[in-house]
From Swiss-Prot:
Single GO molecular function: phosphoglycerate mutase activity
Protein task: Catalyzes the interconversion of 2-phosphoglycerate and 3-phosphoglycerate.
Species in which this protein is naturally found: Bacillus cereus (strain ZK / E33L)
Site (Transition state stabilizer): residue numbering on this chain: H182
Lineage: Bacteria, Bacillati, Bacillota, Bacilli, Bacillales
Encoding gene per record: gpmA
Keywords: Gluconeogenesis, Glycolysis, Isomerase
Gene3D superfamilies with a match to the protein in the record: Phosphoglycerate mutase-like (3.40.50.1240)
Name assigned to this protein: 2,3-bisphosphoglycerate-dependent phosphoglycerate mutase
Keyword Plastid: no
Length: 245
C-alpha cells in the first residue's frame, strides 16, 4: 500500500484579510505559522516519514513545508518546487477583498468565479503591476504558458501534468511523498484521485494545514483517505479543528 500526504499551506496574511491571493506571493500569518507547526507535530506523532517533498514556488506553501519537515526532524528531505503546483491564478481579482468584490459584482457572480470549474475571472493585462511574467522564478515559462487568469480546469491541467510526469513515478517506486500546496491545487488532485464530478468538486473545501492522507494501490487508485489529528485518523466526513500550538 502506498501513502500520499497532501497539505494546504497554513493561513496566509491575505487569507486573514479575506483577499483573493492566487499567484501573489503572500507569506503566512502568525496563526498560519502555528498551524504548520501543529501539522508537523501531528505527522510526527502518527509515525509518518517522507523520502521526497513537493511544493509550489509561492512562499506560503514553501514555508509550510519547511516548518512541517523541521517539526518532524526531516529537514534533509529533498524538496522539489514547481509553478505547476501554484494556486489557481485569480486574474484581475488578485489582491481584492472578497466581500467588497461581491458588493461590486454581486455575490452570485463572485460565487461562479470562485467555485465553478470552467469560468475564468477577469484577466490581468500585461501592463498591470500584478503581472508576474518577469519574476525570475517564472523565467522558464514561455509567454503563452503564463496565465493571465485561470479556471479550475486550467489549474487541474497543469497540476495533473506535473503529477503524471514527476510525482506519480516517485510513488510507484516506493517513495513516501508529501505535497504542500494550495486549496485549488489540492482540489484538483482530489478531483482526479476520487474521480469527482463537477458538482462534487464545487462543494469541496480543503482546510488549511491539516494533513490529508490517501492510501493508494499499486496503480495509484485510492483505497481510502482521511484527515489526521493528534489522536490519529479522523472519522469520515469530519475535519479536525486546529488546536493552540
Amino acid at each position: 500500500m502506498i501513502k500520499l500526504v497532501l497539505i494546504r499551506h497554513g493561513q496566509s496574511l491575505w487569507n486573514l484579510e479575506n483577499r483573493f491571493t492566487g499567484w501573489t506571493d503572500v507569506d503566512l500569518s502568525e496563526n498560519g505559522l502555528s498551524e504548520a507547526r501543529e501539522a508537523g507535530a501531528i505527522l510526527k506523532k502518527n509515525g509518518y516519514t517522507f523520502d521526497v517533498a513537493y511544493t509550489s514556488v509561492l512562499k506560503r506553501a514553501i514555508r509550510t513545508l519547511w516548518i512541517v519537515l523541521h517539526e518532524m526532524n526531516l529537514a534533509w528531505v529533498p524538496v522539489h518546487k514547481s509553478w505547476k503546483l501554484n494556486e489557481r491564478h485569480y486574474g484581475a481579482l488578485q489582491g481584492l477583498n472578497k466581500d467588497e468584490t461581491a458588493q461590486k459584482y454581486g455575490e452570485e457572480q463572485v460565487h461562479i468565479w470562485r467555485r465553478s470549474i470552467d469560468v475564468r475571472p477577469p484577466a490581468l493585462t500585461e501592463d498591470d503591476p500584478r503581472y508576474e511574467m518577469n519574476d525570475p522564478r517564472y523565467k522558464a515559462l514561455k509567454k503563452g504558458e503564463f496565465p493571465l487568469t485561470e479556471c479550475l480546469v486550467d489549474t487541474e491541467k497543469r497540476v495533473l501534468d506535473y503529477w503524471h510526469s514527476e510525482i506519480a513515478p516517485k510513488l510507484k517506486n516506493g517513495n513516501k511523498v508529501i505535497i504542500s500546496s494550495h486549496g485549488n491545487t489540492i482540489r484538483s488532485l482530489v478531483k482526479y484521485l476520487d474521480n469527482l464530478s463537477s458538482d462534487g468538486v464545487v462543494s469541496l473545501n480543503i482546510p488549511t494545514s491539516i494533513p490529508l492522507v490517501y492510501e493508494l494501490d499499486e496503480n495509484l487508485r485510492p483505497i481510502r483517505h482521511y484527515y489526521l489529528s493528534m489522536d490519529g485518523e479522523v472519522p469520515e466526513g469530519e475535519i479536525p479543528k486546529h488546536i493552540s500550538f
